[in-house]
UniProtKB/Swiss-Prot annotation:
Cross-referenced CDD domains: TrmY-like
Residues that bind S-adenosyl-L-methionine: 126
GO biological process, one term: tRNA methylation
Organism annotation: Halobacterium salinarum (strain ATCC 700922 / JCM 11081 / NRC-1)
Protein name: tRNA (pseudouridine(54)-N(1))-methyltransferase
Length: 196
């Protein structure tokens, strides 16, 4: 299982946002929607061995299980609509216990530290100052952690430094978060860029 933990610093934690202004009034939710699409979708299909954790404002987490998800399409508006439903179901979540809003989509009241404690597998921080991804052997069941359009806060960076097994960059140029996810998938799909 591949897991991606994406921190959404400005993302809404309530369902009170318009679907027609994801980059503005929805706090750059468009970035997170693109991350979900990059993590889950392939041409004409979906990866069923992926989980995505969207940590919103360090207080709410939406977990998407690609093996169980239904009704999701790769466009931002569709993904945002399902995230809106998840945030609406937040009242049913009890602490770290998840509530389901639709098949494969779960919401809980937990922040970054609790998510790091819950994931299993080697934690890989995706960061522009890390070692080259190509220099790291592909890992079994990795947990990739990355931030949205903002840098990790000092507190997040400290938690991640303690929890991570590797800190890597995906290339010499800083990429958007969703593009970094695509490169990470390619690294694993090709056994470290060796098998095509």
């Amino acid at each position: 299982m591949r897991q991606f933990v994406v921190l959404g610093h400005d993302a809404p934690t309530t369902p009170d946002f318009p679907l027609d202004d994801l980059p503005g009034a929805a706090g750059r939710l468009d970035v997170l929607c693109r991350c979900v699409s990059a993590a889950l979708f392939v041409s004409h299909g979906i990866r069923d061995d992926v989980e995505v954790f969207l940590v919103l404002g360090d207080e709410v987490t939406v977990r998407i299980d690609a093996g169980a998800v239904q009704y999701m399409h790769p466009d931002e508006r569709n993904v945002a609509g399902l995230l809106k439903q998840a945030l609406d179901a937040k009242t049913e979540a009890i602490g770290h216990q998840e509530a389901s809003s639709s098949p494969g989509i779960h919401v809980s009241k937990r922040g970054f530290e609790a998510v790091l404690d819950a994931v299993s597998g080697p934690v890989v921080a995706l960061h522009e100052d890390g070692d080259a991804l190509a220099a790291v052997d592909p890992l079994a069941d990795p947990v990739f952690v990355l931030s949205d359009h903002r840098d990790f806060t000092a507190a997040e960076a400290s938690l991640l430094a303690d929890a991570s097994d590797h800190r890597v960059r995906v290339g010499p140029t800083v990429l958007h978060a969703d593009h970094a996810i695509t490169v990470a998938h390619n690294h694993l799909d090709t056994a470290g860029f060796d098998a095509y």
